[in-house]
Amino acid sequence: MFEAFRVNIPVSTGIIQWMLNSAWPSIYWQLYDYYGVPCAAYYGTKKACEPLQLIYNYKDSHIYLVNEGLYEGDVEVAVKVYDDASALLSEQSKTVKTSYRNNVDAFDMTAYAGKPHFIALEVKCKDGKVIADNFYCIAAERNVYDWDNFDWYITPIKKHSDLRFAFAQPEAEVAMETSYADGVYTVTLKNDSDVVSYMNILKAKDAEGNMIVPAYWSDNFFPLLPGQTKTVTCKADVAGAKIELDK
């Protein structure tokens, strides 16, 4: 919803977030749970709200560069498209000019409509440093809504999009290296396989195997493309933590 709001500025004029936290352990939709642990939604929201970001618009299957920050000038934008078997279908990059709240139509993805695929996006500044990235699993068909039973707080869904292909990839071989200094764990993951490692979840645990709370990850619940290396950090006031990877 954050991305839908941003990609439609200035037609969209506001947004309300429901909900921030989980009052009970069993509730969902929250950004962090009953115990203060961020959920996947937290990291997705964080990425959606990057000041400068590439966003896929589900309405027209185009990718837009949005800017609600102070940076103005040229940036390099790049897109990679993979099919549902992790084969690279397309790779494009270009230089575009960006300015505050001036959305730029960067890429046309309509050629892939009707087929399940992955989309990986990057924004780079002049020195080649990646300043934003984004990732999508696009189903062959969109959700089908039951508009006849629309109410002010909910629109029921007749048929959900089929995203099972994202979890049907062969298990990827992901190598992990960790280091610790001054209260910060640095974790580097490398996907040594030729398939998309869709959901990589990092956890910091104590000697008894309990999750360390709070633990502040720079990113989590993220994909790794074939051959990709990614480094993240975790601030936790516990030395000797065991870093675990679920995928």
Model regions and ranges:
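Carbohydrate-binding surfaces of carbohydrate-active enzymes
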Residues: 1-219, 224-234, 242
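A compact, surface-exposed functional segment
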Residues: 241-247
